[in-house]
Amino acid sequence: MLTADAHQHYQPDPDVLRGRVIAVTGAGSGVGRAVALAAAAHGAELILIGRTVSRLEEVHSLIAALQRSEASIAPLDLERAIARDYDELAAALQTRYGRLDGLVHSAGLLGSPAPIEHYDVPTWCRVLHVNLTAAFALTQVLLPALRASADASIIFTSAGIARRPRAFWGAYAVSKCGIEALSRTLADELEHSGHVRVNALNPGPVRTRMRAQAFPAEDPSQLLLPEQIVPPYLWLLGPASHGVNGRSLDCQPSGERA
């Protein structure tokens, strides 16, 4: 029987993701990088999606050094990508792998803290596009590959601000509220597919560049490293979470803030 916090205390077997093909956006840094490396260390074959090729190449080299699995790089600038870019990525994935067992959305933009009354419209559009619209577009084109898997998992990275929006969080808060809605809507649509489950994860306070940008006065030494909050991602990507669908979960017990 699954407990409410089973995902937070998950201790995966070394080969829990062996043979699975998993795509991660934002794989060049932060939580996305940590999830990609952890999934590879547990046997998954990775598709590293991100904007900065040099960072993706670094992660690719680290995965190769593990000698546990393989990885491929799929450069994609979510801010500027058009429909053809998504289609080409999906076609290349289908040709090489034939299926997709996991899709982790970790790429994101913070935007600028400002009241709605004065929020910069171009910044608003950029944040909503990268954090929400791009996640929708990529999921849509990859659904056929996910349906080809016997047990596929989609993970949308949410935030505490999605559940309790607060002043001055602007487009970021709205985008994360949208991610929660997108996750639950898609989960309900796929409820009876039997093959694809969809959930959202809130990493909580983590030592990343985005966190430092949002809370410049915060002591980063008091925050967990991205590597320390990946077990819930591995839990949702693997067989231990079979049947878990439409949930919004916290990586940390506090379920805290942004």
Feature locations, PLM:
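Active-site loop of short-chain dehydrogenase/reductase
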Residues: 20, 68-69, 99-101, 146-159, ...
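C-terminal helical subdomain
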Residues: 2-7, 192, 196, 200-201, ...
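Substrate-binding pocket helix/loop in short-chain dehydrogenase/reductase
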Residues: 89, 114-116, 120-125
